[in-house]
């Protein structure tokens, strides 16, 4: 068996906003660690830790790939929309109720009070509680009309925004062909 010492090609960018910067309120520090040999990005920050591996690609340098990806692509790779947004869920459910359910269920004359009752569902409710409350308020509502809106976690959105605004321009500058 042969043991070989490998000195990996890793590049790290550290970002620490100044106390007066707007970003300081959402993220006080973040490190973007690019493992160029394996095509992996690790993001460590006080807004959360995220990681994704693209794998090695002999046809494109990893830093070139990182210089050209867009934020929504990166966000989708490092996270998933799993945070329940009850405010947006209420709005979409009320829209669905007005568009599809009011005539079908014969509740057009009570629509204003029904929508008001949906708006008053506790803003700290879970998605399951929200769903059950809407079903209680509007018996017979089609389950597909009860919209459960999920978003990416705040921390993931923050580190991707910082990547696009500060790190990616630096990568382009440092690795311009």
For each of these PLM feature ranges, what is it?
Residues 1-46:
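Short N-terminal edge-element motif at the start of the domain
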Residues 34-79:
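Aromatic- and glycine-enriched beta-alpha-beta binding-site module
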Residues 60-134:
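Long acidic/polar interaction regions in large eukaryotic complex-forming proteins
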Residues 103-177:
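A eukaryote-biased signal for long
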